[in-house]
Amino acid sequence: MAMSLKKIGAIAVGGAMVATALASGVAAEVTTSGFSDYKELKDILVKDGQPNCYVVVGADAPSTMDVVSAADIAAKIGSLCYKEGTVEDGSADITVHAEANSDDFDLKKDWNNSAMPANAYALFVAASDGDYSEKFENDTGKPSFMDNGVLGDADKINKTVDLGDIATMMKVDDVDPSDWYDSDDDAGEIVMVELKNDTSDGFTVYKKNMLYETLVYKDDEENFANTTKMEEGMRIPFLGKEMVVVDIDKDDDAIYLGTPVYDGIIKEGETYDLGNGYQVKIKAILKTTVNNTDVYKVDVQILKDGKVVAEKYDKAPLELEYKDDVGVTVHKAWENVGGDYGYAELVISKDLKKLELDEEYVTDWKAYAVLNDNGTMKLEDDLNDNNVDKVVGIALRYDGDKLDDLDSGDEVDILDYVKFKLDDEDSNDKLKVYFSMDKDVDATLNIGEKVKALNAEVKLKDIKANAVEPVSLTAPIAKLDTEVSLDTADKNLVLVGGPVANKLTKELVDAGKLALDNNSPATIALIPDAANGHDVIVVAGGDREKTREAALELIKNL
C-alpha cells in the first residue's frame, strides 16, 4: 500500500535527536563513490544554515526500515541547521526564516472535474496542521459550523476547499506548559480566503473575505466543536510566534499577547530582572478569609530604572501591563506553612501586542475574539460575563478594499505572513491557487531566553564572538518518490532505498548513472547534476539491511 507524507510524520527537520540512528555500534562496510570527503555531502545537504535538499523515500517501499532511515537522515540534517545573530550588550538579534506551500487547487479543472463556474464563491482553507483544515471542507457550501457573520458573503459560498497544511505555520502542542489548568491542549493557526469568479472583474476577494485565526483545541482533537476556552497564561501561536495570553480584558474589549520571558514562582519581596532597565516585583501578598475560604491578594509592581511605573493590588488571578513593554499574569498565590511570607506563580512577558476588538490591528485587518457558541464559530467584539468563557481564539479579518482582476502571477498578502497565490504554470489549461510562506521572524534574546517562531525554537545559551545558534526546524523536508521528478527537482535530493524500493533510484540505475542491484553492499553515491541540475545522493544497498547500514554511515560522518 502506498504511503502518504502525513503517515510518515517522523520525517521532518528536527535536530533534537537523531532518533534510532546512532543505536548501532557495529562498524559497517560501506561503498562510497563520487566524493572523497563527507564535507562535500554536508555542503550539498545544508546551505547557509538551512536545508538544501529533499529526503526522498519510496511510496511503495516494501520495508518500513527505509522510512526510519529517511527519518533519521532528515533529523540529522536538522541538527546541522543554524541561525546567525548580531551580539550587543548581552543580547542577540536573531532571524528565523521559513518557506513552505500548501496543496493547490486548479480553478480550471478541480471544481467537480471542471472549471469554477461563473459567479461562484469558493473558500480556501489551510492550517498549521492539515487535520484542522480538513474539518472545514464542504463540497456544497461554507463550513457547516461557521456562522454567516464570520466572513462576508459566507452564505454565498458554494464550496469550501481544504488545501492542507503550511508546514512552517505555527502549532503549539501544549498551551499550558506549567499545568495551571491541568491541560495538554493544542493551538494552531488557520488561514482562509474566499474567492469569487466574478465575470466582470475576474477573480475577486472582497472586503471581509479573508481571515486569519489562532484557535485552542482539546488535546489531539481537530473538529471546531472541540475547541476549548482560551485562558490567560496559555501559549498560543500568533503570526508565526509562540506567545502568552497576558490578559483578556472584558472592560476594554481587548486581548493582550506577549513573548514569554519568565514562567515560575517569585517569593514575596523579590524581583525579576527583564533587562533594559525593567523589573517585576512581588511587593506583598496578603491573605484574607472570605466565606471560610482563604483568598490571597497580590501587590505586583513593574519598575523601570528603579522607579515604579505600574502597580496593581488585587486578588489572584490578576494581570498588569505597562505600555507595549511588559506584561505580568499572576495565576495564584499562597503563603508558607508558618505564614511568614508568600509566593506568586506567574508568567512575565515582553513585547506586548494589544488587540483591540473591532479595531485595526494593522492596516486593513481588524481583530476579533473567536467564540465557540455551542459548536458554532462566531466572531465577537464585545466581551462580557456571558461570552468570555466561550472565547477559544483570536481572529484578524480583512477590512480593506476589494482585490479584483486577479490572475496568474498575482498574490494576495495575508498580514505580511502568508500569501495566497495564483499560477497557471505557463499553461492555458491551468490556474492553480495555493497558500505560500516565505517569512522572516525577528527576535531579541538575552542569555537564557528562548523564542519559538515558525516551528523553530532558538535559545541563547551564551554570548560568543559570533552569535551562531543551532535551531531545530520542524518544517518537513521529506518527499515521496511519487512527488519528485529528476527532471523538475528544485533542490538537491537524498534518495533512500534501492531500485526496488525507490523509483528515482531505479531511474538512475536504468540510465546507467548508478550500479546497484540486489547483491550490492551498503552504498553512498554522489551523482552530480542528476536532478534538473541539482546533485543526488543515493543511500541504498541490495536489501533493507544494507540500506540501513548506509544511512547510519552517512549520519555518523555528517
From Swiss-Prot:
Database matches in InterPro entries: S_layer_C, S_layer_central, S_layer_MJ
Pfam families: S_layer_C (PF05124), S_layer_N (PF05123)
GO biological process: cell wall organization
A GO CC term assigned to this protein in UniProt: extracellular region
Region forming the signal peptide: 1-28
Domain of life of the native organism: Archaea
Protein name per the record: S-layer protein
Organism: Methanocaldococcus jannaschii (strain ATCC 43067 / DSM 2661 / JAL-1 / JCM 10045 / NBRC 100440)
Top-level taxonomy: Archaea, Methanobacteriati, Methanobacteriota, Methanomada group, Methanococci
